[in-house]
Amino acid sequence: MIHSLPSPEPFVILAMPRTGTHYLEALLNDHPNILSNGELLNSYDENWPDKDRLRHSDRELLELAYMRYPPAKKKVTHVGCKINEPQFYERPGFFDELARWQGLKVILLTRNTLESLRSLVQARQTGQWLKFSPDRNEPPSVSLSVNECEAYFKAADDFHARVKDAFDPSKLLMIEYQDLLLKPSACLAAVLAFLGAPAHRFSNRATIQRQETRSLARSLRNFVELRRHFAGGPYAKFFELDDASAPQG
């Protein structure tokens, strides 16, 4: 059965892949009035009972997300979903339709782009996209080419710029993955204030675990070569900062 009552306030989480959107969403769904239903444009996402929904028009998909969303056992005043940058390629007009949705608030989650790419390559190699329990198995160390780094860095820059250009600053909140790990309470308080949702003491019951806890220097086999190549340029910062020092969880 699909919900058809007057729509709660809409929001969307936008990000590059492997930036902590599952973790943020799990924390937000702990709130008694917030419901975030996963990846709207992912046909395999189990939050959505309509597996053929991607055959709908862009407008119909957004109506499904914000007006006829799956029911929840709580009083929902804020409803959202999340979309990763590559998913817009398959629906070229969807971004503009999203930007036109009345009252939409956007949470842009960012991460050290090199960390994001390394994590993406690891997940593709192992087939493990989420981790729900701790174990001693480390993901494989990987190597990245200069070309794939440059392409990914540019894609991230272009996507972040597109989001900032498309939405009024009052409707856009930027959250850093590192801050979400190190200062979750402060980050979540900022998100609630931005959404206009009541304050809430989060239980920290999110079961999603970090898959990689090693530094870039240890998890990226050709880290030194890449750092040397990008030294002095706009992407040198990605080789100076990583989130390995952040706590797991």
Swiss-Prot record:
Keywords: Nodulation, Transferase. It comes from the Bacteria. Signal peptide: none annotated. It holds the Pfam family Sulfotransfer_1. The keyword Transferase applies. GO terms for molecular function: sulfotransferase activity. The keyword Ribosomal protein does not apply. Gene3D superfamilies: P-loop containing nucleotide triphosphate hydrolases (3.40.50.300). InterPro entries: Nod_factor_sulfotransferase (IPR052796), P-loop_NTPase (IPR027417), Sulfotransferase_dom (IPR000863). Its EC number is 2.8.2.-. Required for the formation of sulfated nod factor. Proposed to transfer activated sulfate (PAPS) to a N-acetylglucosamine of the nod factor. This is Nodulation protein H. It comes from Rhizobium tropici.
